[in-house]
Amino acid sequence: MEVGVTLAQEAKTQAMTHTESRAHFAMWAVTSAPLILDLSIDLADASVVEANWDIIANREVICVSQTWSGHPGYLVKSANNTFVAACVAWTCENHTLPEYQIWAKPQPNGTFAVLLVNIDATGPSGLTNLIVPLSELFPPRDFRGG
């Protein structure tokens, strides 16, 4: 997981914006991946800690990560509309990506944590009234015998 990566810290990859870092942290949480902070808060540059504290200390995101209800988060919906992301890192190629993805993670009492990831920097088209059929969140099951 990367939060607060700047070009000066990692020359081989493109730096993530604060918004991208927030989304990345949330993705790790919703997929139940371990949240490991590779930063000694007492030894780190105070400006790095301050700039990212709202991400790494977000109690709600950490709670989603730490809550286990039998299943990690899963992809519910991926946009049909795509865009081409031009890669600026020296080892990377352009990629066709969906404009957005919706992820869900089961929580206690039959609730779900839902994460909308806006992948396209210009904003997804037609996302003002997003409809996700319940059958996509809750796959139908036949509980009758057999």
Show which residues each predicted segment covers.
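Catalytic cores of secreted or luminal carbohydrate-active enzymes
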Residues: A26-E93
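Glycan-recognition surfaces
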Residues: M1-S40
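Carbohydrate-binding surface patches
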Residues: W28-D38, T91-P140
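Generic surface-pattern signal
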Residues: T6, A57-V61, P139
